[in-house]
């Protein structure tokens, strides 16, 4: 069974990918790391700063898979060609993002509203692009019952792997992932299938492997940010030590400071990571509130020192 790191905007960037592999590899390393989505520019002029995220030299270690968020199939195919020129083989199409700002433009899971539009998009992509193309999807817009028609469209194209997040667009990330609906859909899929959604512990990971042994992979998102040693725990039972977690977080902080050219901007990015990580420390509620309000680097650094005096859970 392959384990993948999910693309999460503002979290699973190259700074995180490097720090996670450094501190928790090789046993804690994912087989693949899916990069947060890129939107191909309509003028077909690439922005150097955005493309730096996918520069091969900035992504040593396990394979990285770029993800595209688009609604123009020919434009997406052009971008796939640009990514191939950088040395990437597989490219992933994001048909699952439920964010309102994305779906309002007919992108992400907004593409699932109209099967004809979805079909035309995929036809344009696969007619003009070469090489392996995977897809990340949801079950539908408002009901899992929509997935049968969506899958009929996916079956028309040589999708190398289909990652299914078993929620619908309107759920966002509320409620539970619908594993019953996933179990119903899986036997109907003709392409390799990866599961994604609510995998936060080694026990949940192993339960999925047992329930769905035919999966090609399991993709982990928020659970990986909350516990960067999750895969190591799943493989050999070794959790993150206090020293490892501190080194990992310090590398993130310094990496973001260098990337943004500002420790203040790094603090904002670190608070996104701490949103998931803070619950690893017992009695952290008061410090969590203070951390949310922190603006200055010195405030952040003092609070992190205080957090690391607490017992780890």
Q: What function would you assign to each model-found segment?
A:
Residues 1-313:
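Flavin-dependent oxidoreductase catalytic cores
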